[in-house]
């Protein structure tokens, strides 16, 4: 009778799993603060305590998201250390749009074959972004699916939980005359990658090691894997000022109009003025290479505005100053008007 391998259970490599856990421990612990009582690293669940006495009527806000098929670009390039930043940004920036400050984060990593080095790179990016956002990485799951996912490939998702005072949940008090301020996004972030891959890799057969566009000082691969900006830290700084924030929108799939419309009521419109911000060259290259209509580009991509903050006129300068302190550029891109609940670009 053949002696079974001690390292495999139903084709899942237990030894690789153990090695992965050891390699990620320091990264995970680097996100801990005094509120972490126990973590999923050694317990069945992560325990997190926060001082409710800081709040009058605290409300927990949770959001779950992934990185979509940007993971395929990371796999092709064999570069896994930054896409975890995209994951955290996708989640903490979502809950910041409700006014929430992130407390803790959970991740889920599914791979075709457990590779301890790859796992460490993935988690290192998550940990870096969690630390920047002020969220403790209190647990997660590593799952091996050899029959569903090819070796070297992965799927990545996560959940952020934060807290906000009940009377500060956004949106609120939105009114005609409010100013729409857009925060710059130097890259694509983590949405639209099915169209990106179809354009560059399937149709144009572009080399990821070639220039991103004519005269670019970065390769196409480097530009496509560029990590997302975290806007939650910017918003937390704005929330700490006397700026009167009426609404926020995280600009992901659906573009500016498709996301801003989510904060409107049936009596208000959002009018966004094209040409009021700088569009990064990568979007022009996508459109040229794929012969994509303007309307499609506006539906799929952020086109250089990754986040929107809507405030009354007397709060605009405060928002601009805080953005500058965080090395972000704030553009005045539109306004709220009386209407029927539409968001339009003109």
Where are the language model's segments positioned?
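Glycine-/charge-enriched secondary-structure boundary and capping motifs
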Residues: 2-11, 26, 118-136, 149-154, ...
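Charge-biased, low-complexity intrinsically disordered regions
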Residues: 5, 10, 14-18, 112
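Intrinsically disordered, low-complexity, positively charged segments
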Residues: 15-45
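Glycine-rich beta-alpha junction loops
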Residues: 66, 162-165, 178, 185-189, ...
């Amino acid at each position: 009778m053949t002696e079974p391998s001690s390292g495999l259970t139903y084709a899942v490599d237990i030894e690789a799993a153990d090695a992965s856990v050891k390699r990620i421990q320091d990264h995970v612990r680097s996100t801990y603060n005094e509120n972490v009582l126990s973590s999923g690293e050694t317990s069945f669940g992560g325990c997190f305590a926060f001082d409710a006495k800081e709040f009058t009527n605290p409300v927990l806000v949770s959001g779950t998201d992934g990185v979509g098929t940007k993971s395929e670009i990371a796999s092709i390039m064999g570069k896994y250390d930054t896409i975890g930043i995209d994951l955290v940004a996708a989640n903490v920036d979502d809950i910041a749009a409700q006014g929430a400050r992130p407390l803790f984060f959970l991740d889920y990593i599914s791979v075709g074959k457990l590779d301890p080095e790859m796992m460490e790179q993935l988690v290192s990016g998550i940990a870096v972004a969690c630390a920047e956002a002020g969220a403790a990485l209190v647990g997660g799951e590593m799952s091996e699916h050899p029959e569903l996912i090819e070796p070297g490939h992965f799927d990545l998702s996560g959940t952020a939980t934060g807290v906000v005072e009940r009377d500060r949940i956004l949106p609120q008090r939105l009114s005609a005359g409010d100013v729409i301020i857009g925060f710059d996004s130097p890259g694509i972030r983590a949405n639209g990658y099915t169209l990106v891959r179809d354009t560059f890799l399937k149709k144009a057969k572009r080399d990821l090691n070639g220039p991103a566009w004519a005269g670019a000082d970065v390769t196409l691969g480097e530009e496509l894997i560029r990590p997302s900006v975290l806007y939650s830290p910017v918003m937390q700084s704005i929330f700490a000022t006397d700026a009167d924030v009426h609404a926020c929108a995280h600009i992901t799939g659906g573009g500016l109009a498709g996301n801003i419309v989510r904060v409107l009521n049936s009596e208000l419109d959002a009018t966004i003025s094209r040409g009021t911000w700088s569009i990064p060259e990568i979007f022009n290259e996508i459109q040229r290479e794929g012969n994509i209509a303007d309307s499609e580009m506006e539906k799929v991509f952020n086109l250089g505005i990754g986040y929107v903050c809507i405030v009354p006129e007397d709060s605009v300068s405060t928002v601009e100053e805080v953005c500058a302190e965080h090395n972000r550029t704030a553009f005045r891109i539109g306004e709220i008007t009386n209407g029927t609940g539409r968001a339009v670009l003109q």
